[in-house]
From Swiss-Prot:
Catalysis: reaction(s): RNA(n) + a ribonucleoside 5'-triphosphate = RNA(n+1) + diphosphate
List of residues binding Zn(2+) 1: 60, 62, 75, 78
Protein name in UniProt: DNA-directed RNA polymerase subunit beta'
Record-listed E.C. numbers: 2.7.7.6
Gene: rpoC
SMART domains: RPOLA_N
Length: 1213
């Protein structure tokens, strides 16, 4: 076997007949498979042991030679080589075809490669190949045109006219093969290059296409006649198996049927040729053979597919590769693995952050080999077999051994769908009783798991390296931050939030208020014995907490706090300030002075002078975690999170908060608000009936009225709410529910959506406490049903988007430290009209500067060039009033096949500079795809007014951007830079004309009458600026402006969609994706290079080709940038393996074979496919020193010779 990890590259070419013969171990002559009585393969059949190898290890067919000692012997009786049965997966056979047959991929694909090579139309080819017409091969001295078609009748007439043998014309694949042999590649290419100089329009396009194919043949060394087969390879029998079912029947692969048809027809043709049968019969047989081979290679590509029993189309060789069930996606990109299991998950509140509970019976099965090894080592059993029996019997001693084995042996837990890399994390197993896996509650958010019946899979990393990687890189305690935005992903939720909220509440006049305690223990004792309440404000000696970072004026004093806050601060990391108020000032700058007693001051006096603080909510806990992470990194943070979790659970249990119907308040003035709304609606309808407004206006006014009524109820609800109400506490703390849930319980349900997505005018006036009427209930079902279907559709759409994103960016890896580029990206805050989508501070964090940043007023240098901008630095730059900064960006990175560390910045998942080898492309794809399900599906209608202002939003808009489609509601853009001098309206054509005066001339733009204008007369506009509202078409922008403008525009557009839905994504992720869409250029004029006009190629390859020419003093080629959608960009990748496993498998492989493409295995997918370690992370060459180095070689210091006698005498003495 070839060692896969030593592969340099992989090439695919057309197979020549001699190549096929060299693969083959013998010819398959009979269509038989297995003898149904003896169940032995038939001789010379499709499963023949002589050709393909023995069916049993080390045993020939007749049984003369058995055992491994005869290895390599060929049996003299049955002719079978004694070897492993595994060779039946590797050895191929062949069929000698009695007539040439065309390969359907090259004849039928689009464009038809055969047609382009011969300059014949696919229709003409089809007529010749399927024996409907003759083609003139050599006209000799007759006036016939070469390659012209003749019908049967014309052929006979011409023969009579010019005499037999006066010209050569044939039909069938044989004729095509003769024509292909006659193609003189060099001459044709030279001729086409000449033609290109003058041709234009359709003619030019056709010439470029032909030149492309002929050039591919010329460069790759493939011969065009190999597109016609004279010999057909037969794939190994174990790849098209035949298995016996229970009833004695056989289940066989469809390929066997297809091969059988080919062999039958081939043998019949051979017989007919022997018998010198009439031409028409032979022709018909040849045509049938052609169709049989077509069906074998790609069934259904031409004509109706050949069907098996139950009219099911048979699966041909092409179908074996295509689609989700094909070889690529089913068996190569993802495989089922051993040492795995799955079970339902349950909550494990007592686990540490890095632990998971594994049921005993699951663990013993997963770790069986390890346990068996230990049993033998401890000599409880003599050999492995006995050890295995011991485990299977369930001997008492195995449990202790299991405990030892799993210590420090991490396992991986995965929950489907794995939307981002946090969907697989490593834990240390803890043995538990029961049958459910136990999961730590804080990692649920990363997995998006809950305990309503979710299942998870568990995997065991086997090798030492795999265990080390799981422990160091994948341990759950390490994944505090979300890779998409760098915010903590392990924030407490639900009960934990509620417990800490209740704990940190304050209340005036509760029992024990004003007591003073010497330390925490005394305060807790008072609380436990009922002398002080959790919420009562008490004093504590500051000196009892010496490790806290007190200011000097605060030491040795008494501080006012609550018993709950003493407990809350007790679990905080020691260097964090004592938290009194849920705000950032207290967290970063220290405890405010107002809580400390001056000497001799009365504590009650201080308490009365203080406001009651609001408790700590979910958001505040998130900020505390982020700050903890910033200061102390992962280990301390995960320990702190466990303490926070335990405290939260403990106190939410103690608080005993419950919800009953009485907890839902009644709004006193609900009737008044609703009556007023009814009255207003009546007025609007009256105005409409009088003709004072249009129906659209009336609809908008009515819906607005009801919306305002609902908001008025909501406002009243908030004003009158009791902070001690359990529902209010849940909502306010962020544990569960929000104001809109609350207002549906206590206010009114409000307006509902109709099935068509339009808002209905009749609102639901009741709330859930009062209960809905039958009609109201019916109205509310429309929206609910639409919500369910939308979610289902959205999930599939979002998953497919993620797949395309991963595919286009999978080979983007951090490849070097610094690419040394001199370009940068000028960034400012992203705004949408007046609203800021993303602030400059957010955009600067974690990036490197390109130029130094100076204070706009004082001119002092805030930060030098090529420096990392930290969170504090970003704040400092923005506070100084800087509005734009030039940073290093993925857009301008000069690294080939990836990005450099400086252009990327920090790794958001760790908060440190990114490492070389990080697969940033895949992470970017996951970060953009994972929130896809949260985006809405709908297209917004602006209040039913003119439809051309409809804006696509949510998921469809993201797809529109990444696929570079023409947007709906497209904006008109200007091509000239200058001033808007006039906007004139033309009522007759219902359009407006916008005139822009530039330096070189006047631009005139026609805009629809209903479009909303973005510019006014006198405005200064830049090239590519939008004149009307709407989305700009990116391809058009690329023509008018440059690549960087398009990249910046696309980045801003993606961010607008996500931010509007409250999803934060780091800019760099979008940058990685957009850069992949613009990595190709199209050659316009080849100059002196040997590039072909119209070719799509990578920018780096193009610059290389030009570099050589410029050095030698020639004319360089010119090109223009191309914007490709992600699907197209994936298929245009340089790796044919990656493209073939994505979509359009046969087309990609056909093209790659003709070009003799080499896959240099740079990306992740192609390496996974061939089973090589991926070139990212620890798999990068720089981290894997494959050549063994003797680490502790014996050092020879001095070479001394000693005689034997000398030694013995020395010992004797």
């Amino acid at each position: 076997m070839v060692d896969v990890n030593r592969f340099k590259s992989m090439q695919i070419t057309l197979a020549s007949p001699s190549k096929v013969r060299s693969w083959s171990y013998g010819e398959v002559k009979k269509p038989e498979t297995i003898n149904y009585r003896t169940l032995k393969p038939e001789r010379e059949g499709l499963f023949d042991e002589v050709i393909f190898g023995p069916t049993k290890d080390w045993e020939c067919a007749c049984g003369k030679y058995k055992r491994i000692r005869y290895k390599g012997i060929v049996c003299d009786r049955c002719g079978v080589e004694v070897t492993r049965a595994k060779v039946r997966r590797e050895r191929m056979g062949h069929i000698e075809l009695k007539a040439p047959v065309s390969h359907i991929w090259y004849f039928k694909g689009i464009p038809s490669r055969m047609g382009l090579t011969l300059d014949m139309s696919p229709r003409a080819l089809e007529e010749v190949i399927y024996f409907a017409a003759y083609v003139v091969i050599d006209p000799k001295d007759t006036p016939l045109e070469p390659k012209s078609l003749l019908t049967e009748r014309e052929y006979r007439e011409k023969l009579q006219e010019y005499g037999h043998g006066s010209f050569v014309a044939k039909m069938g694949a044989e004729a095509i093969q003769d024509l292909l042999k006659r193609v003189d590649l060099a001459a044709e290419i030279a001729e086409l290059k000449e033609e290109l100089k003058s041709a234009s329009g359709q003619k030019r396009i056709k010439a470029v296409r032909r030149l492309d194919v002929l050039d591919a043949f010329n460069k790759s060394g493939n011969k065009p006649e190999w597109m016609v087969l004279n010999i057909l390879p037969v794939i190994p029998p174990d790849l098209r198996p035949m298995v016996q079912l229970d009833g004695g029947r056989f289940a066989a692969s469809d390929l066997n049927d297809l091969y059988r048809r080919v062999i039958n027809r081939n043998n019949r043709l051979a017989r007919l040729l022997e018998l010198n049968a009439p031409g028409i019969i032979v022709q018909n047989e040849k045509r049938m053979l052609q169709e049989a081979v077509d069906a074998l290679i790609d069934n259904g590509r031409r004509g109706r597919p050949i069907t098996g029993p139950g009219s099911r189309p048979l699966k041909s060789l092409s179908h074996m590769l295509k689609g989700k069930q094909g070889r690529f996606r089913q068996n190569l990109l993802g495989k089922r693995v051993d040492f795995s299991g799955r079970s339902v998950i349950a909550v494990g509140p007592t686990l540490k952050m890095y632990q998971c509970g594994v049921p005993r019976e699951m663990a013993i099965e997963l770790f069986k080999p390890f346990v068996m090894r230990e049993i033998v080592a401890k000599e409880y059993a003599g050999n492995v077999k006995a050890a295995k029996r011991m485990v299977e019997r369930g001997d008492e001693r195995i449990w202790d051994i299991l405990e030892e084995v799993i210590k420090e042996h991490p396992v991986l837990l995965n929950r489907a769908p794995t939307l981002h890399r946090l969907g697989i994390q490593a834990f240390e197993p803890v043995l538990i009783d029961g049958k459910a896996l136990r999961l730590h509650p804080l990692v649920c958010e990363a997995y998006n798991a809950d305990f309503d019946g979710d299942q998870m899979a568990i995997h065991v990393p086997l090798s030492e390296e795999a265990q080390a990687e799981a422990r160091l890189l994948m341990l759950a305690a390490e994944h505090i931050l979300n890779p998409k935005d760098g915010k903590p992903v392990v924030t407490p939720s639900q009960d934990m939030v509620l417990g800490n909220y209740y704990l940190t509440m304050e209340d005036a006049g509760r029992e024990g208020e004003g007591m003073i305690f010497k330390d925490k223990d005394e305060a807790v004792m008072a609380y436990r014995n009922g002398y002080a309440h959790l919420h009562s404000r008490v004093g504590i000696a500051v000196d009892s907490m010496p490790n806290k970072p007190w200011k000097d004026n605060q030491r040795h004093k008494i501080m006012v706090t609550t018993v709950g806050k003493i407990l809350f601060n007790d679990i905080m990391p020691e260097d964090l300030p004592y938290l009194q108020e849920p705000n950032n000032a207290n967290l970063t700058e220290g405890t405010p002075d107002k809580y400390f007693l001056e000497p001799g001051q009365d504590i009650q006096e201080v308490i009365d002078g203080l406001d009651i603080n609001v408790p700590f909510k979910k958001k505040n806990l998130g900020n505390i975690i982020a700050e903890t992470f910033k200061r102390f990194r992962t280990t301390e943070t995960s320990a702190f999170l466990d303490r926070l979790k335990d405290l939260g659970y403990y106190h939410s249990t103690l608080a005993g908060l419950t919800v009953g119907i009485a907890d839902i308040p009644v709004i006193d003035n609900k009737a008044e608000i609703i009556d007023a709304a009814h009255h207003r609606v009546e007025e609007i309808n009256k105005a409409f009936r009088r003709g004072l407004m249009t129906d659209d206006d009336r609809y908008v006014a009515v819906t607005t009225t009801w919306r305002e009524a609902k908001e008025a109820l909501e406002k009243r609800l908030i004003e009158t709410q009791d902070p001690k109400n359990p529902i209010v506490m849940m909502m306010d703390s962020g544990a569960r529910g929000n104001i809109s849930n609350f207002s549906q319980l206590a206010g009114m349900r409000g307006l509902m959506a109709a099935p068509n997505g339009r808002i209905m005018e009749l609102p639901i006036l009741s709330n859930f406490r009062e209960g809905l009427s039958v009609l109201e209930m019916f109205f509310s079902t429309h929206g609910a049903r639409k919500g369910m279907t939308d979610t289902a559709l959205k999930t599939a759409d979002s998953g497919y988007l993620t797949r395309r994103l991963v595919d286009v960016a999978q080979d983007v890896i951090i490849r070097e430290d610094d690419c040394g580029t001199d370009r940068g990206l000028l960034i400012r805050a992203i705004t949408d009209g007046k609203e800021v989508t993303e602030t400059l501070e957010e955009r600067l964090q974690g990036r490197y500067t390109r130029k130094s940043v100076k204070h706009p007023e004082t001119g002092e240098v805030l930060i030098g060039a090529d420096q990392l901008i930290t969170e504090d630095m970003a704040r400092k730059i923005v506070d100084a009033g800087v509005e734009e900064v030039t940073i290093r960006s993925v857009f301008t990175c000069a690294t080939r096949h990836g990005v450099c560390r400086h252009c990327y910045g920090i790794n958001l998942a760790t908060g440190d500079a990114v490492e070389v080898g990080e697969a940033v492309g895949t992470i970017a794809a996951q970060s953009i795809g994972e929130p896809g399900t949260q985006l809405t599906m709908r297209t917004f209608h602006t209040g039913g007014v003119a439809s051309n202002t409809d804006i696509t939003q949510g998921l469809p808009r993201i797809q529109e951007i990444f696929e570079a489609r023409n947007p709906k509601g497209e904006a008109v853009i200007t091509e000239v830079k200058g001033n808007v001098v006039e906007i004139e309206e033309d009522a007759s054509t219902r359009t407006k004309k916008v005139y822009v005066q530039g330096k070189t001339g006047m631009g005139e733009y026609v805009v629809p009458f209903t479009a909303r204008m973005k510019v006014e007369v006198g405005d200064e506009v830049n090239r590519g600026a939008a004149l009307t509202e709407g989305s700009i078409q990116p391809k058009r922008l690329l023509e008018v402006r440059d690549t960087l403008s398009v990249e910046t525009y696309l980045l801003a557009e993606v961010q607008k969609v996500y931010r509007s839905q409250g999803v934060e994504i780091g800019d760099k992720h979008v940058e990685v994706m957009v850069r992949q869409m613009l990595r190709k250029v199209r050659v316009m004029d080849p100059g002196d290079t040997d590039l072909l006009p119209g070719t799509l190629m990578d920018i780096s390859d193009f610059t290389d080709a030009n570099k050589d020419i410029v050095i030698s003093g020639g004319i360089p080629a010119t090109s223009r940038p191309v914007l490709m959608g992600i699907t197209k960009a994936s298929l245009e990748t340089n790796s044919f393996l990656s493209a073939a496993s994505f979509q359009e498998t046969t087309r990609v492989l056909t093209d790659a074979a003709i070009r003799g493409k080499k896959d240099h295995l740079l990306g992740l997918k192609e390496n996974v496919i061939i089973g090589k370690i991926i070139p990212a992370g620890t798999g990068m060459a720089r981290y894997r020193n494959i050549e063994p180095q003797a680490m502790n070689e014996i050092e020879v210091i001095d070479h001394t010779e000693v005689s034997a006698e000398a030694v013995f005498t020395a010992e004797a003495e």
